[in-house]
Amino acid sequence: MELSHRQGTTTLTRTHPNDKEGQQDMNSFRANHSSLDNSKFKYHARLSQSPLGSSLGQGYLETPPLPPTPTCRTSLAMNSHPEDLKKGASRSSSRDARETFREGCVGEEGQDSRSPEQRTVPLSKKDSVIPENIRHKFGSKMVDQLISEDQARQAIGEMFEGQKRPSSWPSRTQSPMQASSIFSDYYDLGYHMRSNLFQGPPQETKSLMKASYTPEVIEKSVRDVEHWHGRKTDDLGRWHRKNAMNMNLQKALEEKYGEKSRSKAK
């Protein structure tokens, strides 16, 4: 079998033309090829009518079909009758019907996107200017009663406009006198008002440490070893206490017997 490929045509030549099976294959192949050629011709005609066909020329792009919307699916189910399927409607006619329905659905979606005012869609939380934490804290009903979305947008717009005004920005060409006059009211408040201490007017303060803890008080004080404030009662404290007593005893013994040994040596 020899195949010669051309644009839109395909020719087949068999070496055994008298074979009946070969003739049947040829007839079935021609019938299928003619139906494919008709569908391709229709698709080329649609592309030539569209603005993309003029720019692409003879070549064409196979665009994947758009997924039908729920309304289109219902319309397709309504319009498809079992009688048409029983009669054996051609595939090309069903494809044409589907394409027309898809075009209509796409047109409806485009109209919906172009005219959002006609659709009454409730305002979502994402589009709201008021943060969700405020609505959660005070309740959405209370927030809606106190402030509306328009008022919130207006307040935010005024704030941004005030920031964008050049008059509100501190100019770099201001003299130090002008700069000091701007903050004069702030510095007139005083240190206590500016630091939020509010301790009142300054007063003469006198420490009572020397008046209460005089040398007489320290001399008359009696230290109770058993009930000494800050005394450690754990094993480490006991060991240090015993060690201090041993060191003091050793020093006393050295002083006592050291003097006796020195006197004997003399």
UniProtKB/Swiss-Prot annotation:
Q: Where is the composition biased (Polar residues)?
A: 1-15, 24-38
What residues form the membrane-spanning segments? none
Q: Which UniProt keywords apply?
A: Cell projection, Cilium, Cytoplasmic vesicle, Flagellum
From start to end residue, where is composition biased (Basic and acidic residues)?
Answer: 81-102
Q: In which tissues is it expressed?
A: Only detected in testis, in the spermatids and sperm within the seminiferous tubules (at protein level).
| Effect of deleting the gene | Mutant adult male are fertile and there is no significant change on litter size compared with male wild-type adult. No differences are found in testis/body weight ratios, testicular/epididymal tissue morphology, sperm counts, sperm morphology and spermatozoa motility.
Q: Where in the cell is it found?
A: Cytoplasmic vesicle, Secretory vesicle, Acrosome; Cell projection, Cilium, Flagellum
Q: Where is this region: Disordered?
A: 1-124
User: Per the record's keyword annotation, is Methyltransferase included, yes or no?
Assistant: no
Q: Where is the composition biased (Low complexity)?
A: 47-63
Q: Chief localization class?
A: cytoplasm
Protein name in UniProt: Ciliary microtubule inner protein 4
What are the leading ranks of the lineage? Eukaryota, Metazoa, Chordata, Craniata, Vertebrata
